[in-house]
UniProtKB/Swiss-Prot annotation:
<feature type="compositionally biased region" description="Low complexity">
    <location>
        <begin position="443"/>
        <end position="504"/>
    </location>
</feature>
<keyword id="KW-0472">Membrane</keyword>
<comment type="subunit">
    <text>Homotrimer.</text>
</comment>
<feature type="compositionally biased region" description="Low complexity">
    <location>
        <begin position="520"/>
        <end position="588"/>
    </location>
</feature>
<keyword id="KW-0813">Transport</keyword>
<keyword id="KW-0130">Cell adhesion</keyword>
<keyword id="KW-0843">Virulence</keyword>
<dbReference type="InterPro" id="IPR011049">
    <property type="entry name" value="Serralysin-like_metalloprot_C"/>
</dbReference>
<protein>
    <recommendedName>
        <fullName>Autotransporter adhesin BpaC</fullName>
    </recommendedName>
</protein>
<dbReference type="Pfam" id="PF05658">
    <property type="entry name" value="YadA_head"/>
</dbReference>
<feature type="region of interest" description="Disordered">
    <location>
        <begin position="420"/>
        <end position="746"/>
    </location>
</feature>
<dbReference type="InterPro" id="IPR008640">
    <property type="entry name" value="Adhesin_Head_dom"/>
</dbReference>
<dbReference type="InterPro" id="IPR008635">
    <property type="entry name" value="Coiled_stalk_dom"/>
</dbReference>
<keyword id="KW-0998">Cell outer membrane</keyword>
<feature type="region of interest" description="Surface exposed passenger domain">
    <location>
        <begin position="72"/>
        <end position="921"/>
    </location>
</feature>
<feature type="compositionally biased region" description="Low complexity">
    <location>
        <begin position="646"/>
        <end position="700"/>
    </location>
</feature>
<dbReference type="GO" id="GO:0009279">
    <property type="term" value="C:cell outer membrane"/>
</dbReference>
Amino acid sequence: MNRIFKSIWCEQTRTWVAASEHAVARGGRASSVVASAGGLEKVLKLSILGAASLIAMGVVGPFAEEAMAANNAGVCLTYNGSSNNTSGTGGWFADGCKSAGWVQGMVTNSKTDWVGLTADDTQIVLDGSAGSIYFRTGGINGNVLTMSNATGGVLLSGLAAGVNPTDAVNMSQLTSLSTSTATGITSLSTSTATSIASLSTSMLSLGVGVVTQDASSGAISVGANSPGLTVDFAGGQGPRTLTGVAAGVNATDAVNVGQLASLSTSTAAGLSTAASGVASLSTSLLGAAGDLASLSTSASTGLATADSGIASLSTSLLGTADNVTSLSTSLSTVNANLAGLQTSVDNVVSYDDPSKSAITLGGAGVATPVLLTNVAAGKIAATSTDAVNGSQLYTLQQEFSQQYDLLTSQVSSLSTSVSGLQGSVSANTGTASGDNSTASGDNATASGTNSTANGTNSTASGDNSTASGTNASASGENSTATGTDSTASGSNSTANGTNSTASGDNSTASGTNASATGENSTATGTDSTASGSNSTANGTNSTASGDSSTASGTNASATGENSTATGTDSTASGSNSTANGTNSTASGDNSTASGTNASATGENSTATGTDSTASGSNSTANGTNSTASGDNSTASGTNASATGENSTATGTDSTASGSNSTANGANSTASGENSTATGTDSTASGSNSTANGTNSTASGDNSTASGTNASATGENSTATGTASTASGSNSTANGANSTASGAGATATGENAAATGAGATATGNNASASGTSSTAGGANAIASGENSTANGANSTASGNGSSAFGESAAAAGDGSTALGANAVASGVGSVATGAGSVASGANSSAYGTGSNATGAGSVAIGQGATASGSNSVALGTGSVASEDNTVSVGSAGSERRITNVAAGVNATDAVNVGQLNSAVSGIRNQMDGMQGQIDTLARDAYSGIAAATALTMIPDVDPGKTLAVGIGTANFKGYQASALGATARITQNLKVKTGVSYSGSNYVWGAGMSYQW
């Protein structure tokens, strides 16, 4: 019979075991069963029998088929050193527990508590003593362990971080890999922009992530220092592939190859988690400092070296696609960055070799020299390693020429003096009165301690001073004056050149007529002047009068505090200003002018480019002939102009003249306050207007034009789309060639036109020309005032008319056409239904093909026709052709009217119920009347019979006085009897009387006659 088992928890062994479905826990009713160690053997037998049953039924995953096909299969279990096995092929192994074939190296005879399941060489072992699970696959099918279900892989969760090279990794390790890789790649990109040397360091940092490679063995390890238990999938034939793994979701889940399917071969080659691959790339990049042209080849070699490491990594990691999206993205970024790096390398200036001792412009071995331009003036000092520019060399040449001439003169004078000495020593009339002083030359005077005066009329009065040259004077302590008429009066000052002057402490004046009067000032060049404290003037006729100012270049002038003027005729007069370029001017405080004729006159202004001008406060002009005159304005581009306050002009010939305006694009113009013009030839002239698109125009206040040739001229208008036009106030045109010319009009769709005030046209070629009209749908037309046309090709031409549906037409004033091809041409008419027609005034047609032609007529129903005036046709095919009639059918197609309420008023219709009730009442009345008639007839018949009976009584004969008689009669079955008497009173007077009886009625009568 069938046996059903369930899993229970064994407290003794701390494992799950199989038990009978009827087993219960200690304590009676419970949801679990606890097995004791004493009954473990029986329970394990049941477990293994259950497992064997599952294998036989093919429900234990991929092992079922293998077990059924195996030549020798069985199970073994041991507990406390004892084993229990049965023998037989396909059953229990008699010697299975001692077989050497059990997961070699994993289970030995010394193991005391373990359960084994085997089918040929394919085995599963639960090692209780070690707390491990072992898998082994046979040699026939390869070293593959597959986990799957009916629909795909199986999720392997609770996976500890892998340690050894053949360990599986979990999601957390892969996420760490992705993060560290992305970080390394980002570092690569940043380092490339900074320098090639920092790129090497950033790439090396990639190796410290979760995936590393041993430089000597090339082995790859994943999370080598990660703690946790071990799941070992190795077998007798070495490491094996783990297959059938579902896509990992949680942090500790294993990942499968499917999740890495999106990583292309080039991407895999681009990722080098191996330290040797990264080292190769790093070495190549370092070598690129000497010859960057080889970077591409070296990088390719380094990446190719890492390819084998990636293949191993792919095998170990078992891949992922969904959960390493960021890794794939990062690698794509690497490819892009490397491509950009190669492009950048072609123009990089690099060292000739790794020693970084030489740089050859143009590349090592290139014979053609390279021009180095725009070199700033280098610092001239004993310890300076700065490069000097042509201007400094020119000044040096001039000084050298002057000094050479002076030296020639002095040598000539010295020669003459020496010749004079040979004749007479008395020719030297110099005076050296200072301690250790020296005076050489006519009237030379050295009065300072350790001073030296060398030259005619030279004077060295300062301690440790030196005066060399005719009329040279060094009066400052530690001062030096070299050159004819040179003067060094400041402490530690130096004057070098004809008529040069260094009066400031620690000042230096070099060049003919050079003057350094400020403290710590430096003047270099003919007629150069440095009068400000810590100022520097470098160049012919250069002037640095501001404190901490610098003037470099012929006629350069830096008069502002902390100002810098660089270039011929450059001027920096503002505090903290900078002028860089020929004839550049920076007069505003904190201003910067860069470029020939550049001018920055506004406070905090910046002018960059030839003839650029920034005159507004905080303004910026960037580009040839650009102008930024408004406060906080910005002009970028050739001939760009930003004259409005807070305005921005970007692009060639762009103009932003309005306050807070923005012009972006060649020839763009933003003249309105708070206006924005974006796009070539765009214009935004209205206040708060916006023009976005080539040749777009927004001239109305608060208007917006978006699209090529779009135009918004109306106040608060909006035009969106190519060639769209919104000219009406508060109008909106949306769509190519759309037009909204009416005030408050809206046109939406290609070629849509809303020309009426408050009109709305929606749909391609839709037109709304009437005031407050609405046209919706392709080719819809609403020309009447307050008209509505909704539907393709619909038309509403009457005032207050409405047409809804394709090709619907409402021509009459106040008319309504609803339905495809519906026509309402009569005034106040309504046509509802496809093909319905309401042509009569105030007529209504409801239903497909219905027709109401009579004035005030109503046709309801498919094909219904109401042609009579005030007629009504109700129902499909009904015809009302007569005036003031209601028809519910047609000739031959009459129909009943059902569910009619009982009429109340005199003109109400009555229903059959009311009619039946009336007929019944009349019938009852008729019945009553008939009874009365019958009674009357009976009475009449009786009366006739009674009267007849009276007449039948004979009269009194002549000559007789009295006659008494009886009579009888019958009329229509009614019998009567009569008694009468006649008396002759006189000859001339006669009396007659009688009574008659018929049924229940009596008739009597009397009479008298007089005869003569």
